[in-house]
Amino acid sequence: MRGNFIPREYDIFTGLDVSKKSISVTFTNHQGFIRSLNMPHKAEPLLNYVRKHFPDQKIAFVYEAGPTGYGLYDGLAAQAYPCLIAAPSMIPRAPGQRVKTNRLDSKALSENLRGGQLKSIHIPSATYRQLRHLTQLRDVLVSELAGMKQRIKSLLLFEGIEFPPAPAGSQWSFLVKDKLRKLACSGTVRFKLDQLLDSLEFNEKQVLKTITEIRRFCRNDPELSQCMKYLMSLPGIGWITASQLLARIGDWRELKNIRQLAGFLGLVPTEHSTGERVDRGSITRTGDERLRSKLIQGSWSAIRQDGELREFFRSVCRKHPREVASRVAIVAVARKLSVRISVVLMKQRPYEVREKVHSAPLTQEETSPRERLDDEQNREGKTPDGSTLETEIPGLCALKRGAFRVSVTAVCRATNSSKSLFGREVKES
């Protein structure tokens, strides 16, 4: 269902608790409860019942997102019935409720729909659903491939057999696998290793077939092909990340503003503010974890290609303690990259560098994970750049294992600053 749901425009509100074989249905109207019943998990019996008992009345439906997918939604939408699919985490729950049944769940959905307390998730079109199936299959196969490689290495380690030496990036080349098949092993170990190698080669073929199918599918669809070109014009975005983004975002026309995608990916900070006091914490981590991980991986590539993003990365690093600086900064870059993704999709044009920013290449120290301050630095109270804290911020105690002994608020009072050392805004009420 597109647009906002307005309860006063409908007469009957139908809550559906959908399971594998049946549907628990509850009907309510503006006056209250009407009836509850069970029926088979098909759209036809539900439609026949509605036409028979509620003729000439405007009816709305809602059910929870889950493993049953969009089949019921498609059946209702085909007959022009509005249907919402609500995210389970966004459905109001009574804190004192101790009884849960299908009938009570469908009744709660119906009442919440009547009260206008539910919002539908984004429902992708058939094209984007097919692309999502392909990208999910690739993720599963790649995960299985990594597990198979780990099982082979674990077997060799357990048996005290050295893995054949190979250059970085070529550990699983044809030559290495050929050496593994020729290793001197006992009978059962040899059999197990051969079976694992056969499974490894089969998984590799499955991954290649899936990748080929994703490329073919995107190439044959004009809209997907165009959007892929726009996304791949961004630094740090390759065809794998681009296809994953399109599969999860769906129709780009549903994007309302350039910040919505960052919220969808869980790259915006949590916030607990009251009055004039603003307190922001870590990112929300909502949405697809795999897609967020891919975007962060792409951000590492982006800061090597784009001078503006590289300088932004460095500026964020300077605001945070040494042991977390690079991790916090790369997440900030990923959020900035998500805004660029939204822009190229909403404006349907490739990314163009506004002004080339001259920036020194990244060093190994900047990109590698930073360890905690050692004991000597803790005693001396050194900052990430090596200077002492007492000379820069009056009244500040020394660091102890990366944590300040005095509160951030006290530091801000001492320096009359509106920002803490962690880059968060702190305002006193």
Tell what function each PLM region has.
Residues 5-28, 109:
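Gly/Thr-rich phosphate-binding beta-strand-loop-beta motif of the actin/hexokinase/Hsp70
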Residues 276, 313-429:
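Low-complexity, acidic/Ser/Thr- and charged residue-rich accessory regions of DNA metabolism proteins
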